[in-house]
Amino acid sequence: MGLGTTTVPTNILPQFGLHRTHLNPIRVNNSTGFSYPLSLRKNKSFDRLVCFAVDDEIREKQQQQLSTSSTRLGSAVEERPENKDMIDGISEEALENFKEDGERSAIYDFLYPSKELLPDDKEMSIFDHLEELRERIFISVLGVGGSILGCFAFSKDLVKILEAPVKSEGVRFLQLAPGEFFFTTLKVSGYCGLLLGSPIILYEIIAFIIPGLTKEERKFLGPIVLGSSVLFYAGITFSYLVLVPAALNFFVNYAEGAVESLWSIDQYFEFVLVLMFSTGLSFQVPIIQLLLGQLGLVSGDKMLSVWRYVVVGAVVAAAVVTPSTDPLTQVLLAAPLLGLYLGGAWMVKLAGR
């Protein structure tokens, strides 16, 4: 038939708000195509009814749902290009702001200098860099090795120089094991050779990194290297003249009247050499401050504002660096560390950082 119908059970009519009285049940004659109304009583023999009203209501609800979904889908499709353009605009704007901030940052300029600022810049492969690094390490090892051999030739004289701070206190040194003095002279020669060969190591490091430095950085490199070297040797000298005698005299006076001072030659030189080198390294505090100020990471005012924490940090650093546990040595090292920090902070502030 041309007319579409739907057959439904009678027990679902209340779900659509319909009752038997609202419908006009129709029976279809399949042979003639004629339909005529039936009473509900007569319809009890049939299991199903042909209900046009229910079919129309279901179809109307389905059409409403489809139209609503189509409207929402169309709105989403229309709004999508606008949202995409807006997101792309925000991303491009954020990227431009990031680039502008990076160009104004000292760290960005340090990591990505322009080619005009690199006079000796040239393209090199990773293997060329490794080859150059190998050569410079080899030269540094040769320089330090030669210095160690030279110091070993005068090892006994160096031992006497390092024994001088406590010679006047009546301290005697003993060799407690076979070959202890021989290995002690090797240790003294190694430390002294490293000290004398450090300029060669420093030169090779500078020669390796200087092609990647700008003109402004090269101007800044000279004072940094010179200041670092001066402070390192000043720290060693300060340790030999002040810290070592103070610490050793403290131990001698503390044991006076109770025990005789007979010290192991190996442990004595280990104590003295470690104290001297750790003091030289701790004197590099102003250099670190200048580097941080030059990069714009910390200002001079900020360094000066945290001086209370610096006092505590200097005492803790002195306790860690010094191999002895006496408070006198720690105070004698903490005081110059605090002075160096304050001096470095004022230098950064005067430099306009």
From Swiss-Prot:
Entry keyword annotation includes Chloroplast: yes
First and last residues of the transit peptide: 1-50
Recorded GO CC terms: chloroplast thylakoid membrane; TAT protein transport complex
Record's compositionally biased regions (Basic and acidic residues): 77-86
One GO BP annotation of this record: intracellular protein transmembrane transport
Transmembrane segment boundaries: 137-157, 193-213, 224-244, 271-291, 303-323, 331-351
Residues in compartment: Stromal: 51-136, 214-223, 292-302, 352-353
Domain of life the protein comes from: Eukaryota
Location in the cell: Plastid, Chloroplast thylakoid membrane
Coiled-coil segments on the chain, per record: none
Membrane topology: Multi-pass membrane protein
Further remarks about this protein from its record: TATC targets to thylakoids via a stromal intermediate, and then probably integrated through a thylakoid translocation pathway.
UniProt family annotation: Belongs to the TatC family.
Subunit structure: In thylakoid membranes, TATC and TATB form a large receptor complex, containing about eight TATC-TATB pairs, which binds the precursor protein. Twin arginine signal peptide promotes pH-triggered docking of TATA oligomers to TATC-TATB receptor complex, inducing a conformational switch of TATA that results in activation of the translocase. TATA dissociates from TATC-TATB upon completion of translocation.
Full protein name: Sec-independent protein translocase protein TATC, chloroplastic
Source organism: Pisum sativum
Organism placement in taxonomy: Eukaryota, Viridiplantae, Streptophyta, Embryophyta, Tracheophyta
